[in-house]
Amino acid sequence: METPVRLWSQHLANLARAAFWLLLAVVILLQLGGSRGIDRQRAAALGQFERERSSRVIAMIHRQEGASLLGVPVAGSISIDDSEAVLRAIRLTPAEQPLDIILHTPGGLVLAAEQIAKALVERKGKVTVFVPHYAMSGGTLIALAADEIVMDANAVLGPVDPQIGDMPAASIVKAVAIKGPRNVSDEMLVLADIAQKARVQVASFVVQVLLKHMPEKQALQVATVLSEGRWTHDFPITVEAARLLGLKVSTEMPRTVYDVMDLYPQGGGTKPSVWYVPLRRAPAQAGSTSQPSPDTRPEGGNAAR
């Protein structure tokens, strides 16, 4: 016969289990509801941009978002899933219609980036890539395929030199050349062979992409600079540097692009590390100069935009 104390303990355990499952259900429902709400806002913002530009707009934005079941941050990068989605959107867009891509990415899979870039090069309508903050590595490869690149004045592109695992292909080849083939392992020799092939492949592809916008000699020079590994992989190519390379770059970034970026907040659930009071411009009156007035609501974010 069970004692009252044991019965009471079992009752508490049952209540605790029920409370746990109830809390889990509430968390899931809140996440689903919040996700649908932000998706509607994003669709509305992209729709507004399409109306402003009379174009098809595709956003490929890789943020570290709380995308998992319990809000654990998941960092994004260019993947095969991304290339499939972008190619599908391009197929659904009339050939002559302008195509605008909002691009914010650290890079990702070379194959996926090359698929997207090839599809953009083959477009008949004008292709414009907007880079509000950065488009590195594979993101730069996609940007090179555009007829025009619109960058924020402080935005950056990056080198497209291939990486073998966590190591730059150019550095692998250089290391083997310094030590000599007889003084390195078979594994390193295999890596060096793969690295050299990757360098040739990427450089060749960049040339093919750039031939749409510049002479072959210039395209070869630009491809060499971007893919030979003269810089570290995170080297920032600024607006000025991109123009010196011969890329067609504008800094006339539409306000709507920043509005779209605001709908992709940096995830993680941590306290923002950057705080500021945004300025709000008062309506201009006749005979007076409008001055920005501070919004009394402080805003915070993980990166200034």
How should these model regions be labeled?
Residues S137:
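Catalytic nucleophile serine of serine hydrolases
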Residues M1-T128, Y134, V150-D152, P162-R305:
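N-terminal organellar transit peptides
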Residues P132, T140-D147, M151-A153:
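Internal, hydrophobic cores of structured domains that mediate oligomerization or house catalytic pockets
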